[in-house]
Swiss-Prot record:
Enzyme class: transferase
Name of the protein: Protein N-terminal and lysine N-methyltransferase EFM7
Family from the record: Belongs to the class I-like SAM-binding methyltransferase superfamily. EFM7 family.
Species name: Candida glabrata (strain ATCC 2001 / BCRC 20586 / JCM 3761 / NBRC 0622 / NRRL Y-65 / CBS 138)
Principal subcellular localization: cytoplasm
Disulfide bonds: none
GO molecular function: N-terminal protein N-methyltransferase activity; protein-lysine N-methyltransferase activity
Length: 256
């Protein structure tokens, strides 16, 4: 046996078995049903088959209660988005933006962290759910909170502000509150609204979640609580905290 053959055999000891690394989770799907489609909605599509990424460190692989609540809220109050400029931060599956596009947003800009899989997944949902005649009005953009706004406002055909900014299940990012609020302050139209919806996924940190609505005042924004409802919690593992985790909080924020 040659030295080369011996070396190759030795190196072969370190070859990974085919099943050594777990297979990357595949995308999966969730169905969302629009319960009350408003008369002014440009599309009467009711069933939305959402593709979700297989896994995500940013939790974009789940369809959260907050996203479902937000989508229903837009159908209930379509004037929030009809012929309006809409921005969604941290969109994940982009359900609220998709509903805004179906209702007839002038422009819906859907954003999330610029991860390739996440962006491709959002674009897939836009391509498969939004009718061709409305696709031009729904734009997908990777965005890191706190960065320059030009990549967002370039989609507005001359406008520089958004009539509605959607923050669905984002306030658990406590160290990002300032960036979220600065972005909201800077990009919200004078008479616009931000719609903030969340569930307390970590009940012991609920006060830190709610601090968002105190900190917003430092940015010249006024919070208005819409309601708190109880839905089925996303996870069943801890009965003691189930009630808190079942909560869905909804707020508006406007310029003071």
């Amino acid at each position: 046996m040659s030295d080369t053959e011996s070396l190759n055999d030795a190196l072969g000891l370190f070859d990974e078995p085919e099943d050594f690394r777990p297979e990357k989770p595949k995308e999966h799907y969730a169905n969302y049903e629009r319960i009350d489609v408003p008369d002014i909605s440009k599309s009467k599509i009711t069933n939305l088959k959402l593709q979700l990424v297989g896994s995500s460190p940013l939790w974009g692989h789940l369809l959260w209660n907050a996203g479902i609540y937000t989508a229903r809220h837009l159908d209930k109050y379509p004037e929030l988005v009809s012929n309006k400029n809409v921005l969604e931060l941290g969109a994940a599956s982009a359900l609220p933006s998709l509903v805004a596009g179906l209702i007839g947003a002038k422009r819906a800009v859907v954003t999330d962290y610029p991860d390739a899989d996440l962006m491709a997944n959002i674009q897939y949902n836009v391509n498969t759910i939004i009718p061709d005649e409305l696709k031009e009005n729904v734009r997908v953009e990777g965005y890191i909170w706190g960065n320059e706004y030009d990549p967002l406002t370039i989609h507005l055909d001359g406008d520089k502000k958004f009539d509605l900014i959607i923050l669905s299940d984002l306030v658990f990012n406590h160290n990002q509150h300032d960036k979220l609020l600065q972005t909201t302050k800077d990009l919200l139209a004078t008479n616009g609204k931000a719609l903030v919806v969340f569930s307390p996924h970590r009940p012991h940190l609920l006060e830190a979640d709610l601090q968002f609505f105190e900190t917003c005042k430092e940015y010249g924004l006024t919070p208005e609580k819409i309601e708190m409802v109880n839905w089925k919690p996303m996870f069943e593992e801890d009965e003691e905290t189930a009630e808190v985790r079942s909560r869905v909080y909804a707020y508006y924020m406007t310029h003071a």
